[in-house]
Amino acid sequence: MEARAQARYIRVTPMKARRVVDLIRGMDATEAQAVLRFAPQAASVPVGKVLDSAIANAAHNYDHTDADSLFISEAYVDEGPTLKRFRPRAQGRAYRIRKRTSHITVVVSSKEGTR
């Protein structure tokens, strides 16, 4: 049994979001929630929301209400589209600002069947 959740077009750079996702990959779901709650990175907030959504999807789709028996089987961050902006500089120049976005995916599975 596995349940997945995805957040798309999140305004966090993929490199910074991957640092957070690498922390929780393979952890128990409740332990990962605690780690994300106290992680100092800004990307831990959207990753935590995706994890909560994956746990809720498992409860809804499979009547699997016990979050203690779930673990994170897959977690990855893909790069979304980049918003391009310009910052005016001296003597008529302009520097490009790239505002990167991320697609965050978390898959939770039950422990008894997979591990």
UniProtKB/Swiss-Prot annotation:
Q: Which organism is it from?
A: Streptomyces avermitilis (strain ATCC 31267 / DSM 46492 / JCM 5070 / NBRC 14893 / NCIMB 12804 / NRRL 8165 / MA-4680)
Instruction: Name any one GO molecular function.
Output: structural constituent of ribosome
Record's function text = This protein binds specifically to 23S rRNA; its binding is stimulated by other ribosomal proteins, e.g. L4, L17, and L20. It is important during the early stages of 50S assembly. It makes multiple contacts with different domains of the 23S rRNA in the assembled 50S subunit and ribosome. The globular domain of the protein is located near the polypeptide exit tunnel on the outside of the subunit, while an extended beta-hairpin is found that lines the wall of the exit tunnel in the center of the 70S ribosome.
Task: Please name the gene that encodes this protein.
Answer: rplV
Q: Which domain of life is it from?
A: Bacteria
Q: How does it assemble?
A: Part of the 50S ribosomal subunit.
- Pfam families in UniProt: Ribosomal_L22
Under what name is this protein listed?
Large ribosomal subunit protein uL22
CDD domains (alphabetical): Ribosomal_L22
**Membership in a protein family:** Belongs to the universal ribosomal protein uL22 family.
Which keywords does this Swiss-Prot/TrEMBL entry list? Ribonucleoprotein, Ribosomal protein, RNA-binding, rRNA-binding
Q: Which GO terms describe its biological process?
A: translation
Instruction: Give me the Gene Ontology terms describing cellular component.
Output: cytosolic large ribosomal subunit
Q: Give the matching HAMAP family.
A: Ribosomal_uL22_B
